[in-house]
Amino acid sequence: MSFVPVNPKPFLQGLIGKPVLVRLKWGQEYKGTLQSVDSYMNLQLLNAEELVDGVKTGDLGEILIRCNNVLWVGESTV
């Protein structure tokens, strides 16, 4: 398996309106629909759920995740 670097801004813009999974540096994960991304790469999610160890712990609704807390973002397959 090889690593292919990707420019993050177009990647995130392409995920708008799609379900995403966001993992924070501290281990928490949030799943929801990516509503918007700003120039600092802060993320706004709709219908967000918090996951701890892959288990849903609650519904949060609309949330904003500050860019400096994000470890990675990917399209959610579930």
UniProtKB/Swiss-Prot annotation:
Q: What is its main location?
A: nucleus
- KW RNA-binding (keyword) present: yes
Q: Which residues cross the membrane?
A: none
* Location in or out of the cell: Nucleus; Cytoplasm
Sm domain residues:
7-78
Q: Which GO terms describe its molecular function?
A: RNA binding
Cellular component (GO) terms are: catalytic step 2 spliceosome; cytosol; nucleus; pICln-Sm protein complex; post-mRNA release spliceosomal complex; spliceosomal complex; U1 snRNP; U2 snRNP
Recorded hits in Gene3D superfamilies, A to Z, give: 2.30.30.100
Q: Which key words tag this protein in UniProt?
A: Cytoplasm, mRNA processing, mRNA splicing, Nucleus, Ribonucleoprotein, RNA-binding, Spliceosome
InterPro entries with a match to the protein in the record:
Lsm6/sSmF (IPR016487), LSM_dom_sf (IPR010920), Sm (IPR047575), Sm_dom_euk/arc (IPR001163), Sm_F (IPR034100)
| Key word Ribonucleoprotein present | yes
Biological processes annotated in GO: mRNA 5'-splice site recognition; mRNA cis splicing, via spliceosome; mRNA splicing, via spliceosome
Q: Which Pfam families does the entry mention?
A: LSM
Main function: Plays a role in pre-mRNA splicing as a core component of the spliceosomal U1, U2, U4 and U5 small nuclear ribonucleoproteins (snRNPs), the building blocks of the spliceosome.
Q: Which PANTHER family match?
A: SMALL NUCLEAR RIBONUCLEOPROTEIN F, SMALL NUCLEAR RIBONUCLEOPROTEIN F SNRNP-F
Cite the record's note on assembly.
Belongs to the 40S cdc5-associated complex (or cwf complex), a spliceosome sub-complex reminiscent of a late-stage spliceosome composed of the U2, U5 and U6 snRNAs and at least brr2, cdc5, cwf2/prp3, cwf3/syf1, cwf4/syf3, cwf5/ecm2, spp42/cwf6, cwf7/spf27, cwf8, cwf9, cwf10, cwf11, cwf12, prp45/cwf13, cwf14, cwf15, cwf16, cwf17, cwf18, cwf19, cwf20, cwf21, cwf22, cwf23, cwf24, cwf25, cwf26, cyp7/cwf27, cwf28, cwf29/ist3, lea1, msl1, prp5/cwf1, prp10, prp12/sap130, prp17, prp22, sap61, sap62, sap114, sap145, slu7, smb1, smd1, smd3, smf1, smg1 and syf2.
Similarity comment: family membership = Belongs to the snRNP Sm proteins family. SmF/LSm6 subfamily.
Q: How is this protein named in the record?
A: Small nuclear ribonucleoprotein F
